[in-house]
């Protein structure tokens, strides 16, 4: 999502990867 690194997604306002 916007503001997250490639391969990451936003969860609870934070970016998570993997």
UniProtKB/Swiss-Prot annotation:
Instruction: Tell me where in this chain the PTM Glycine amide is found.
Output: 18
Gene Ontology cellular-component terms for this entry are: extracellular region
What compartments host this protein? Answer: Secreted
List GO molecular-function terms, semicolon-separated. Answer: toxin activity
Query: Is Secreted tagged as a keyword?
Result: yes
- The record's disulfide annotation reads 4-15, 8-17
Tissue expression per record: Expressed by the venom gland.
Keywords, in A-Z order? Amidation, Disulfide bond, Secreted, Toxin
What is this protein's record name? U1-poneritoxin-Ae1e
Species the sequence originates in: Anochetus emarginatus
């Amino acid at each position: 999502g916007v503001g997250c690194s490639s391969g990451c997604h936003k969860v609870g306002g934070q970016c998570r990867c993997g």
